[in-house]
Design a protein with these regions (language model features):
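Metal-dependent nuclease catalytic cores that hydrolyze phosphodiester bonds in DNA/RNA
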Residues: 1-126, 237-238, 242-244
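Metal-dependent nuclease catalytic regions and adjoining charged, substrate-binding loops involved
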Residues: 3-5, 86, 149, 162-247
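Generic recognition of cysteine residues
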Residues: 28-30, 77, 131, 135, ...
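Broad hydrophobic/π-residue packing in well-ordered secondary structure
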Residues: 34, 57, 139, 153, ...
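Mg2+/Mn2+-dependent nuclease catalytic core
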Residues: 105-203
Length: 247
């Protein structure tokens, strides 16, 4: 299956056929929820927290105006005023576009789609900014810089770097172009060093045999018991009240 546009890339068929960083992370969080998403039985709702990042992404892609035309409700309240989410996204955009270094790292080929084989299965990736022979940069809009490590972006960097190398572009360094949603936007370029990327790829390799077997229907997925999907399909059980008192 070829993936030449967003419709194909994000299709249910593509998610069944390919692995991606987001799908791998889904399996790490909850195998049952990840399996349900692949089967089309569960769809994780988009949150307001994700919207600001999406708007900034679309500006760098050059498709923000298209989104405004297609979904005006994202931008405007019923009274015609700009929504707070878009106002914040607009602040971030105006701030980072005045910074030469930030814009240079985001000046590569936008949303480049890669397809390759790794660990015996097909993978897909879409790069925010690809500078051939120079670097891979991923745009991140986060609450603050401390939250960057929480989201484990080294996993994303490891997969993207491996994909770029497998597609014949060589091994390139991986950077995060990060901006915050704080009252006064903070922004910087973070390089994830090679030893960290190597460890992340080794971790993925160790987990993939089980995840591949689950996706293929050869093993049963584990239910984490705490995510929204697990709560949506659970059955009541008798529990000890003292569980709630544990620190």
């Amino acid at each position: 299956m070829k993936l030449s546009n967003d419709e194909q890339y994000y299709s249910k068929e593509a998610n069944r056929s390919y692995w991606s960083v987001s799908q791998y992370k889904d399996f790490c969080k909850c195998e049952a929820a990840a399996t349900a998403k692949i089967r089309g039985e569960y769809e994780q709702p988009t949150t307001k927290a994700m919207l600001i990042g999406t708007l900034v992404d679309r500006w760098f892609e050059g498709t923000l105006e298209q989104l405004r035309q297609e979904s005006p409700n994202i931008f405007y309240c019923r009274n015609g005023a700009l929504r707070a989410d878009f106002r914040k996204a607009d602040e971030i955009i105006k701030r980072v576009q005045r910074d030469e270094r930030f814009m240079r790292f985001m000046s590569g080929e936008k949303q480049k789609i890669l397809m390759w084989e790794m660990f015996g299965v097909p993978w897909k990736a879409k790069l925010d900014s690809f500078c051939d022979g120079i670097c891979i940069t991923d745009l991140k809009v986060v609450q603050n810089f401390k939250s960057l490590a929480f989201w484990r972006y080294e996993l994303q960097g490891a997969v993207y770097q491996a994909g770029v190398e497998a597609c014949g572009y060589g091994r390139l360094p991986f950077y995060l172009a990060a901006a915050t949603k704080e009252a006064v936007t903070n922004f910087d370029i973070f390089q994830i060093d090679q030893p960290t990327l190597d460890l992340a790829l080794a971790e993925i390799m160790a987990n993939m045999p089980r995840f591949i077997a689950i996706k293929a229907g050869l093993e049963e997925p584990h239910y984490c018991g705490v995510c929204d999907y697990c709560k949506s399909v659970k059955k009541a059980r008798i529990r000890n009240y003292s569980e709630l008192l544990e620190v």
